[in-house]
Design a protein with these regions (language model features):
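Acidic/glycine-rich C-terminal interaction modules and beta/coil loop segments
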Residues: 1-81
């Protein structure tokens, strides 16, 4: 999430909620692993876009949602110097 100003080791504050608006940064659980991504839902497709140009987007069919779940909305972060 470096392109969003969030660096490794920063504390990110999450408001627990099951949905977010397109383009918002969310905590997302993928196969039991947590990650931060920008979420875009278009029809039956969910695209999880990293805010880091070094990584490609992840695309899921909405039928895959048993493996993918939005845990909450990122509402702020603290950068530790």
């Amino acid at each position: 999430m470096v392109d969003a100003g969030i660096k490794n080791g920063d504390a990110v504050y999450i408001r627990k909620q099951p949905t977010v608006e397109n383009g918002q940064i969310a905590a997302v659980r993928i196969n039991g692993e947590a990650t931060l991504k920008r979420v875009y839902i278009n029809g039956n497709t969910m695209v999880l876009q990293p805010a880091n140009a070094s990584y490609p987007p992840l695309t899921y069919s909405l039928s895959d949602l048993e493996d993918v779940a939005i845990e909450g909305l990122a509402v702020g972060f603290t950068h530790w110097f």
